[in-house]
């Protein structure tokens, strides 16, 4: 008889299984870190960090965590409630195929989706090249020389085009913008939202009936129209130009492979969506939009722009160009608050074009159009009135009294058609359509008993339905990069080559302050590519999206619990758009009370640049509030300015914990001062990762906050987007949350789709569900512990600029490098570049204080990784001391010359320090070394010699 092995007490549950996977430090590490800080427990540390005035404000009431497998099964059951019917709705959203090598090697690859915005170009060359490919794709197809690195969605891009035209039009007397009624309805809705606070009148009408062109400073046209017609806009554009108005054209990128591009018929701006280049429908997003314009207007273009420069060795290198245009620099003078792009989605579109090449894209476009032409010919034989003479992929049909019955019949057959009105319906085809789909559509639209057309006969007899005078004559995608990677092997290796050039979370900690580069767990990411979430059209009938409704309802409740607010909107598809929606809600609230004069927004001097930029966009005037020597809001200055502007005070925008990395003791008093003067308090949720489960902004004075789901709640940054920026509000602001034409409240849309970037919301649902209430609280506590551990280890080498009353920081700390500039000539930029030689992404540079580094380790980094970073920073300080002592030359030293490339080390070595010191300053680097692909990039050269499309092939051959 065999004795039973006694394993002792075993926990049979999996409630906290994921928490230990998400949080980096082990229990023993946590105790060691606490001991170093002089605390006996995590509770004691947190008790000394959180101000007494807000302790107990948390209302986090969530169930216990759930194991990974259990959470995935639970979410799968929710997803199963969605019914992804075959969609022919169109209206800017189309079925497409995501090529398998792009799905596996890019979209599902953490080397791509965990990277940050490429502000440090030397360690971002891979995704910068991919984005340059995207810009070249857009520039080629639009016929305009300058394209940016993507926008949030087509409707947002259209709104940016409107304000762009307002700034640049020489028609200074007009406040009216013409928008064709043939534009997508969701675009028109966002235009109206964005125009009203700026005093712009959006006139929606038929462009063929315009009598006084001088009444408008600009216009937006759709090409082809939403209903499918291909219109010759050449004369119309000329008439607008004759009165100094600018013209923006919303154009379908796939159609532009066959049609004359907007730039060739005079458009000043082209905007649109790249969704159909390999990105799933996703119930509306995320998708990459595009924005292209003339060279003369490049400095006024919104969004990010990738350009070509050189490194210090004269080698071509990519970088973000003309960054002085961006809102974080221009602040209240900014003309846009866009501070991100849809990089991951733009890179998918970029690689879709690289993989298919010009001939592949033309095949897709021609096949899509031919099938549409055959469909139209068959419908006409069946007696159905096709309203378009010329079209690309979309038809509108006059179906009269039969319309409702046809829709019902289609849905019973698993098909969605576009609902235009009671007597008309629409059909949009795409790259996934085949002969059987066309025959099925004939069957749905035929009268009972009618014989269906013969497909083969119609295919042979029907011609194209593109207007001859608008056929494209110019070549597309002639650059070699679009003509060499057409086999899966070649594309796979190209993607690997690019990924190897970059630093992302799959290689190293990214300690960027105010960015919260935490773990994006694999189990959170898996549902993103489920067909149940990816294949649903955002305008499908409501009964087909019950799974999404359950997901969003549950997620809104979770976020209310985390923040203490009463209502949440998930529509904003970036933090900047959440800010905008929050200030719009405040503005609308004041107007509803007859307080339209309230237009003053108080903003601390330490605020992120989006805050003043957003305030300006909603028509508010910014008044800056001073900060004291410890980095806190100067309460007396706030009191004086709130009192001075009492009758006009609309809002205070404040980040909490502060952008200086401190929990300000006076936050309740600050909120009360503003409320007493009739204002509302907007608490920027960028730093929510320090608060979840510990304190709740909705309970200590906030009226509204936006949350960065791509920070606190684990949606990956994707190399610079996507993001989600939902807003939470107190009950009195709930009626003023963003609306949508397909929702109960019709006005106030800030995104094209009702739920913005809906298909990545499962990431946050999974994170919250697996962590549970206790896990979320522990994440906040560990983020604070990790930040204080780094601050404590480094404070004897670099001054920690700000701390709270107990000498502790929140979830991030700021190191002051300004004294080093005076003593050694070493700048913050030199330290940032030197960190690359150690295999690290630099912390946030010179924000919120010039000459500093802001470090945010997050809860996901282990003690070993924190120590590795601290060891690197300490070794760098030793190198600076060597410069101070004269042991290293002030100009020829490892910091001034950083980063060092492999090619440099293999070449002739003329430096006063060794190759080993340059490349292997720590012994640990011998085991695993990251090599920056280029040396330090010359920013000035890049802006003076601006090139924003793919460089000639010779540049690639030099690699």
Curated annotation (Swiss-Prot):
EC class of the enzyme, as a word: oxidoreductase
Pfam families: GcvP2_C (PF21478), GDC-P (PF02347)
GO molecular function: glycine binding; glycine dehydrogenase (decarboxylating) activity; pyridoxal phosphate binding
E.C. number(s) listed in UniProt: 1.4.4.2
Assigned keywords, A-Z: Oxidoreductase, Pyridoxal phosphate
Reaction it catalyzes: N(6)-[(R)-lipoyl]-L-lysyl-[glycine-cleavage complex H protein] + glycine + H(+) = N(6)-[(R)-S(8)-aminomethyldihydrolipoyl]-L-lysyl-[glycine-cleavage complex H protein] + CO2
Cofactor(s) of this protein: pyridoxal 5'-phosphate
Modified residues (N6-(pyridoxal phosphate)lysine): 711
Record-linked Gene3D superfamilies: Aspartate Aminotransferase, domain 1 (3.90.1150.10), Type I PLP-dependent aspartate aminotransferase-like (Major domain) (3.40.640.10)
GO cellular component terms listed in the entry, alphabetical order: cytosol; glycine cleavage complex
CDD domains documented for this protein: GDC-P
Gene Ontology biological process: glycine decarboxylation via glycine cleavage system
Subunit structure: The glycine cleavage system is composed of four proteins: P, T, L and H.
Function statement: The glycine cleavage system catalyzes the degradation of glycine. The P protein binds the alpha-amino group of glycine through its pyridoxal phosphate cofactor; CO(2) is released and the remaining methylamine moiety is then transferred to the lipoamide cofactor of the H protein.
PANTHER family referenced in this protein's UniProt entry, alphabetically: GLYCINE DEHYDROGENASE (DECARBOXYLATING), MITOCHONDRIAL, GLYCINE DEHYDROGENASE, DECARBOXYLATING
Similarity remark: Belongs to the GcvP family.
Designated name of the protein: Glycine dehydrogenase (decarboxylating) 1
Upper lineage: Bacteria, Pseudomonadati, Pseudomonadota, Gammaproteobacteria, Pseudomonadales
